[in-house]
Structures are given as C-alpha cells and as structure tokens.
Amino acid sequence: MKKTLALVLSLVLLLTAATAMAATEINYWSVFTGGDGAIMQGMVDAFNASQDEVIVNHTPMTADDLYQKVPLAVQTGSGIPDVCVVHIERIPNFVNQELLYSYDLDLVAEAGIKQENYNQAAWVKSTIDDEQYGIPLDVHGYITYINKDLFDKYGLNEILADGYITFDEVKWAGDKAKEQGFTGKTFDLGWQRAQLLGYYAQLAEGHKLTDDGIAPSLDKEAMKKAMETMKELYEQGYTSSKTDDYSSMFYGGEMLIWSEGIWMKAAVVDAGVNFEMYPAVCFDPANAKSWMSSHNFVQFADEERTEEEDLAVAKFVNFMGENSLVWAKDAGQVPAHVSLNEVAEFASMPQAFLADPAREDELAIYYYLHWGLFDTAISRVNWDFVDGTIAIDDAIAQIEKEVADAIAAQ
C-alpha cells in the first residue's frame, strides 16, 4: 500500500512538473507606473491565475525609458520583450524604423482577437499598408469635467442639455456665476498641447499635421483660430493663469469647468467633487472632437520568437481586452474592447460616452510619422502664444520649422 501511494504521489508530481514545463513564458513591458502600474499588475496576475498555459512576466517603466530601451534591445538582439504597450502615436515611426512586427491576424484570431471586437477609431490608426501593428487596450484623452454642485448653485445646467459645452457657453457660465458672487475661475488652461490639438481637430479637416506624410504642414488658419480662442479666454479673465494650481482649484470648488484627462477621474472622486464629464469644449457641437490617444499592444522585432510565443501573446492580449472593466473602473480609462459596452457597470461610468461607436468620429487620434518631434515642438510654445511672449503666427511657424529642422538633422 505504501509503495502504491508513493508511486501515485510521484506520478502526480511528475504531471504537475510537466504541466509547469509546458507553460509558455512571455515577457511584457508596459508604460504604466504608479497607481496605473499596480492596476496593470493586478490584471496580469488575474490572467496568470486564470489558466496554466501562459505565464506573463510584467516589467513596468516610464514611457521615456521604454522608448529608449526597446529599440536598443532590438538593435542588439538581446532582451527583447515579447509584447509591449506603447502609445499609438509612436507606432508609425517604429514601423518606419522596422522595429515592429505586424500581427498574423489568422493566428491571433485563434485566441479570439478580431477587428470587429475593438474600437474602430483606435484599431485603424495602427493599420499601416494593410498590416496590423497594434491591438488597442484603451482609448484615453482630454475631456471636460464640470462641478455639478456649482452648476446647480448658479443655475448653469441649461448649457449641458445637448451633452456638449461650447466656448460661448463657457463665457456665459462664467459671467452668470460671477454675477451671483462666484470669485473663482471659469475654465483652465492646463496641458495645453492636449487642449490645443482637440480644438485644432475640430477645425482642420482630418486634423492634418502633414501633407506628404513626412514634412510638417499645419492648417494654419485652423491652428490660428484654436490658439486665438485660448488666448482670448485668458485675456478676458475666464481661465487659470500660468502659475495657478488649476487642479487644486477644481478640487476646491474654485473652478466651474475643468479640461483634463480622463485618467484624473480617481483624483476627482477622492477630492469629493460632485462632477460630470463631457467632450472637450467645442466651437460647434456638430463637429465636437477631443484629443485622444490609445495604449496599444505591439510586438517588437525578434527573430528568435516562436509561433507558440506569438499565440501565447495573443491569448494574453485577448484576455486583457475582455477583462478590462477594472482598467475602466480603477484607472479611469475607456476599454477598447467593445464587449465592455454591454457591461452595465461600465455603461454607468462618466467616461463611457467615449466608447459609443456612433461617436467614434469625435475621437481625434493623431497619426504622424514624426509625432515625437511634433509633440516636442508644439509643447514648447505652450503659454508663450497665450500670454503674448510670441505672436501666434510666429508660434505656428516655429512649430513647423523646429520639426522640419529636426527631420533634416536625422
């Protein structure tokens, strides 16, 4: 009997070991740190616990670190992660440098990944020359928060009836609240690059940054109007100033309307603000657009990666999409997997309007080969064009020149 029991235990141990050996191990790098990093780690842990075929090792780091380390790993052929999360704007340049592999859509379909399962505004932006280089985890961007208690107090709710807030309505709300004794600010100028690109997208057809795909070429009249609108709001006293802590002002009831990222929702909740979310402030509700981005799963080039590992990655990515409710709830993001649209808990979240397929044309996701250079150039003129340090025409010319010079220097 003892020999039989020992034999059975030995077989169980052997089978357990064989199962563990059969698991495919993949390395995953992400740009999520801090609170988002902890939430992402929890999602990875949930995947690992859900099955025994794939083990995912998650390495979080800042976006800047990842964008420096991964190309170096590809060049040396050493330490290349099997899957990464990157911002969608970076994908065209990675493809141009031949740093990314496209997905085998037949293979990933075996794991459940299909185009129709995803937010189309995000999916198509990572389709290049009919090849799919990214699978979106989410869409996220710069929208509008309002302090509902202040709106109730000062009788401002009529401007919310259609679900949009225009620039004229911002001024109307500020004037009406001030007439009743409100001493705070109406609106903020915060991360101006994100605000400006949302407003520009409402005016420039296709929110173009280039004509030929390479050289910078802005719609100058559209950019000028967007900049002039921000400058006018500042000069007329409706907005926060350069030195203001605009977030604290909103948390403390000293601001009516706050332009911020959806990822700040948890902080607003923690501050105890009774709030609602709307699209970015617009010129015309018929053409409302908000600057948006998307975290995408990509696979950097690695000749040693096997088909088995590619399938393991696909299983992981599909799980993350189907189980991204926590990403919406705790990280404040908008899952790109459309199955979440049918989940009542998500539908009740304030950012859920960004997932509405009928409103995908309101998501201004930018696509430009030299996005990194453009991002640096447009960010450099923040506040300068608002406070008059630089003339608006000169600011626009400076953006284009800086990008063109940087391209020429490569």
Residue ranges and their predicted role:
Residues 23-33, 54-59, 82-83, 133:
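Short, well-ordered beta-strand elements
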Residues 33-55, 378, 396:
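Short, polar/charged alpha-helical segment
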Residues 46, 50-118, 153-155, 256-257, ...:
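Extracytoplasmic "Venus flytrap"/periplasmic binding protein-like
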Residues 49, 154, 228, 235-238, ...:
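Extracytoplasmic/periplasmic substrate-recognition and gating elements
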Residues 87-143, 168-171, 274-279, 345-348, ...:
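Hinge/lid segment of periplasmic solute-binding proteins
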Residues 89-99, 120-160, 189-212, 291-301, ...:
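Periplasmic solute-binding protein
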Residues 171-176, 212-242:
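Glycine-centered hinge/linker elements that transmit conformational signals in sensory
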Residues 278, 329-384, 410:
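Long, aromatic- and glycine/proline-rich binding clefts that accommodate carbohydrate-like moieties
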